[in-house]
């Protein structure tokens, strides 16, 4: 039972993703239903802080890649469910993920033009959002950039 597992946790960081090679059914089960189940469990267990990895521009249908439409649909609606959940959320929408060492420099928000970000830098960003009040109840794109993670998050508009 998920609620029992997370009882007593300070926060949930949801990073699960179906990957690019699963069908629409797995995408919906993992990226949408899995996210919603953890949101529901968080509320039942009294865990108020919830951070989720989404997808770059998941909030902008006009920018969705046609070949990845089921993925974007799942991320979009998971984001919307989280925003309406009453939880203290942060939605992090990374650009294209790359398997390179972290550089610990990012660009966030409207200034984050389509680009890539290392998986390690996404992880560092997620940890930095945990207690950064400027990220509470916010959703933003993130790519590798010029500012330190702390500076970028503190300056998020």
Regions flagged by a language model, labelled:
Residues 16-18, 54, 96:
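Short, small-residue-rich loop/turn micro-motifs
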Residues 2, 9, 44-49, 56-157:
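Oxidoreductase cofactor-interface core, primarily capturing Rossmann-like NAD(P)-dependent enzymes
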């Amino acid at each position: 039972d998920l609620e029992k597992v997370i009882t007593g946790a300070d926060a949930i960081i949801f990073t699960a993703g179906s990957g690019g090679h699963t069908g629409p059914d797995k995408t919906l089960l993992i990226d949408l239903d899995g996210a919603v189940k953890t949101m529901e469990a968080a509320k039942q267990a009294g865990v108020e802080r919830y951070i989720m990895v989404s997808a770059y521009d998941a909030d902008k249908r006009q920018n969705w890649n046609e070949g990845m439409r089921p993925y974007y649909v799942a991320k979009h609606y998971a984001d919307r469910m989280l925003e309406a959940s009453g939880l203290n959320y942060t939605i992090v929408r990374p650009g294209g993920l790359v398997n390179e060492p972290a550089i610990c420099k990012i660009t966030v928000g409207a200034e984050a033009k389509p680009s890539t970000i290392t998986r390690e830098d996404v992880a560092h960003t997620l940890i930095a959002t945990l207690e950064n009040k400027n990220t509470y109840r916010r959703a933003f794109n993130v790519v590798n950039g010029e500012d330190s993670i702390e500076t970028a998050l503190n300056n998020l508009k």
